[in-house]
From Swiss-Prot:
Main location: membrane
Record CDD domains: 7tmA_mAChR_M1
Ranges of biased composition (kind: Low complexity): 238-247
Topology Cytoplasmic: residue spans: 49-62, 122-142, 210-366, 421-460
Subunit and interaction comment: Interacts with GPRASP2. Interacts with TMEM147.
Name of the protein: Muscarinic acetylcholine receptor M1
Organism: Sus scrofa (Pig)
GO terms for biological process, alphabetical: adenylate cyclase-inhibiting G protein-coupled acetylcholine receptor signaling pathway; chemical synaptic transmission; cognition; entrainment of circadian clock; G protein-coupled acetylcholine receptor signaling pathway; G protein-coupled receptor signaling pathway, coupled to cyclic nucleotide second messenger; phototransduction, visible light; regulation of locomotion
Ranges of compositional bias, category Basic residues: 328-343
A molecular function (GO) term: G protein-coupled acetylcholine receptor activity
Keywords carried by this UniProt record: Cell membrane, Disulfide bond, G-protein coupled receptor, Glycoprotein, Membrane, Phosphoprotein, Postsynaptic cell membrane, Receptor, Synapse, Transducer, Transmembrane, Transmembrane helix
Membrane topology: Multi-pass membrane protein
Length: 460
């Protein structure tokens, strides 16, 4: 993906001379053709994976989907047209095709860098303002932001590229060459490089550093929280949120109804509540919520240890319930049972924080891979842009060509970054490439910390 507006081909250089040998032409053609094929294939896999695998339809991946669309445009049109330009030594497709190619290239690339900024800001606010921001973080809002990114990119570049010659009254692009007319001055090229590359990179690196610092602070807080837990009676860790149970010898048995009312307190349910919007890249994980729209006839049974098991009379136990059993409806007619352990507020808080921390680190890992690929592939060309501003003849034309093509290689690398950092993408890619997607059998296995085993429902 060109995550910066692709710089214009310098008007001061001559593209590959017609005298290039046949072996050089063959090498360039085969290499660039393979890169184009890999770019198109990789980004098509991203789009198809998003379509067929519902696990990937998360807010994070909407931004990756937009990047893949831009990369697909680059791999399909920009790479091949630029290769033709290089191999022929001149632009032979006419002025209209030249302007359309440049407009498409710049719009897609600028939209990509804006989407990368959106990902960075999304990660930053998700980490620093998890409650207020995630409540507003919906697929519809993500789609709106992506649409605005593309619209702004189109407005900034397309009219200027297509109509500049009519504004100034003449076309000054040299015959047989293809570059943006208003970028023919080095100082203007320098300004666009600063705005389109150096400024976004600075912002993204700053945001990533803040994300890293915040994630490390979360890890330290989690370690302190887990270290503060002390063993309690019944094998669980003690917590300030525990509720006392009358369990001394000779004390009357707690009525089941009273237990159910006590344990249905909102604070206890909150310990087992997971927001569906927190479901991210890996795995389709079922959320246990306290919504009112759940189906009757099924229930959650959470078994908690008695204070003194020997003091209880087995003969008085009802055959299908006990005082230490909590019920509440579920959606699918089965039960979740946590045997031998009482839900502890601090323990469940630690589990939620652990899950959130793992998710944040995974998203930050994907962002770091994309950002690193962007910097590595785009920095060489933009350094040459700065050098050429002060010394026009200091950069050989071969370096210009390699630097420009290296920017395109970013579109080839990005799908690899998604697969490297995201197991769901990786597995889907593998199954699609092996033509085995239809044979896959999904099994929903709870993966969240604190997930409890699902068994057939029973009544209290």
């Amino acid at each position: 993906m060109n995550t910066s507006a692709p710089p214009a081909v310098s008007p001061n250089i001559t593209v590959l001379a017609p005298g290039k040998g046949p072996w050089q032409v063959a090498f360039i053609g085969i290499t660039t053709g393979l890169l184009s094929l890999a770019t198109v294939t990789g980004n098509l896999l991203v789009l198809i994976s998003f379509k067929v695998n519902t696990e990937l339809k998360t807010v994070n991946n909407y931004f990756l989907l937009s990047l893949a669309c831009a990369d697909l445009i680059i791999g399909t049109f920009s790479m091949n047209l630029y290769t033709t330009y290089l191999l022929m030594g001149h632009w032979a497709l006419g002025t209209l095709a030249c302007d359309l190619w440049l407009a498409l290239d710049y719009v897609a690339s600028n939209a990509s860098v804006m989407n990368l900024l959106l990902i960075s800001f999304d990660r930053y606010f998700s980490v620093t303002r998890p409650l207020s921001y995630r409540a507003k973080r919906t697929p519809r809002r993500a789609a709106l932001m992506i649409g605005l990114a593309w619209l702004v990119s189109f407005v900034l570049w397309a009219p200027a590229i297509l109509f500049w010659q009519y504004l100034v009254g003449e076309r000054t692009v040299l015959a047989g060459q293809c570059y943006i007319q208003f970028l023919s001055q080095p100082i203007i090229t320098f300004g666009t490089a600063m705005a389109a590359f150096y400024l976004p990179v600075t912002v993204m690196c700053t945001l990533y550093w803040r994300i890293y610092r915040e994630t490390e602070n979360r890890a330290r807080e989690l370690a302190a929280l887990q270290g503060s837990e002390t063993p309690g009676k019944g094998g669980g860790s003690s917590s300030s949120s525990e509720r006392s149970q009358p369990g001394a010898e000779g004390s009357p048995e707690t009525p089941p109804g009273r237990c159910c009312r006590c344990c249905r307190a909102p604070r206890l349910l909150q310990a087992y509540s997971w927001k569906e919007e927190e479901e991210e890249d890996e795995g389709s994980m079922e959320s246990l919520t306290s919504s009112e729209g759940e189906e009757p006839g099924s229930e959650v049974v959470i078994k908690m240890p008695m204070v003194d098991p020997e003091a209880q009379a087995p003969a008085k136990q009802p055959p299908r319930s006990s005082p230490n059993t909590v019920k509440r409806p579920t959606r699918k007619g089965r039960e979740r049972a946590g045997k031998g352990q009482k839900p502890r507020g601090k323990e469940q808080l630690a589990k939620r924080k652990t899950f959130s921390l793992v998710k944040e680190k995974k998203a930050a890992r994907t962002l770091s891979a994309i950002l690193l690929a962007f910097i590595v592939t785009w920095t060489p060309y933009n350094i040459m842009v700065l050098v050429s501003t002060f010394c026009k003849d200091c950069v050989p034309e071969t370096l210009w060509e390699l630097g420009y093509w290296l920017c395109y290689v970013n579109s080839t690398i990005n799908p690899m970054c998604y697969a490297l950092c995201n197991k769901a993408f990786r597995d889907t890619f593998r199954l699609l490439l092996l033509c085995r997607w239809d044979k896959r059998r999904w099994r929903k296995i709870p993966k969240r910390p604190g997930s409890v085993h699902r068994t057939p429902s029973r009544q209290c």
